């Protein structure tokens, strides 16, 4: 396999790790309402687990309120139950036609817990990026050993993958800093 191809595959895989991290960060609660908070909340919709956004309209009319309007009004109870069972710590208010979720202010203690979660998720993403780098390094060494690439090309490839890794880790750190600031903002 060509070095360029290896590096391109590595970059694609690293970008997927970063996209996954962004998705994880979107579902972490801050003091503000966001429809992404409900992404992982699943309800039992006629026997199959479905995300809430596939059975209802979700809107954010105010910075600290989410309104869920199910298309099928009989699903209100199931949606309410799923939200209560989730780890979001939100209490749904039901008026018969829609569910209102008021996002309470986060306590200082809860903010610190959330920051720890942010750090852990960022660290997991860094580990994933480093594992991709290791895979490419191993592939380069294998190619060099098989004499399909020269020693100079292998060393050049190692330098390039390290630069790519450093850039992606920097990007992860920037995302982490933004999310941390968002969580700690009162």
Language model features with spans:
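Short, intrinsically disordered, mixed-charge
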Residues: 23, 81-89, 120-124, 134
């Amino acid at each position: 396999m060509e070095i360029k191809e290896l590096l391109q595959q590595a970059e694609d895989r690293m970008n997927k790790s970063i996209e996954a991290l962004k998705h994880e960060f979107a579902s972490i609660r801050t003091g503000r309402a966001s429809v992404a908070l409900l992404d992982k909340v699943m309800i039992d919709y006629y026997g199959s687990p479905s995300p809430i956004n596939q059975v209802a309209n979700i809107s954010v009319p105010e910075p600290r309120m989410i309104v869920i309007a199910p298309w099928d009004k009989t699903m209100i109870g199931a949606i309410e139950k799923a939200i209560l069972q989730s780890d979001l710590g939100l209490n749904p208010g039901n008026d018969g036609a829609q569910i209102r979720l008021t996002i309470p202010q986060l306590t200082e203690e809860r903010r610190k817990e959330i920051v720890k979660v942010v750090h852990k998720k960022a660290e997991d993403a860094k580990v994933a990026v480093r594992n991709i780098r290791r895979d490419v390094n191993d592939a380069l060494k294998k190619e060099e050993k098989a004499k399909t690439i020269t020693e100079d090309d292998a060393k050049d490839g190692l330098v390039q993958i390290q630069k790519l890794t450093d850039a992606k880790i920097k990007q992860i750190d920037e995302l982490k800093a933004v999310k941390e600031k968002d969580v700690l903002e009162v």
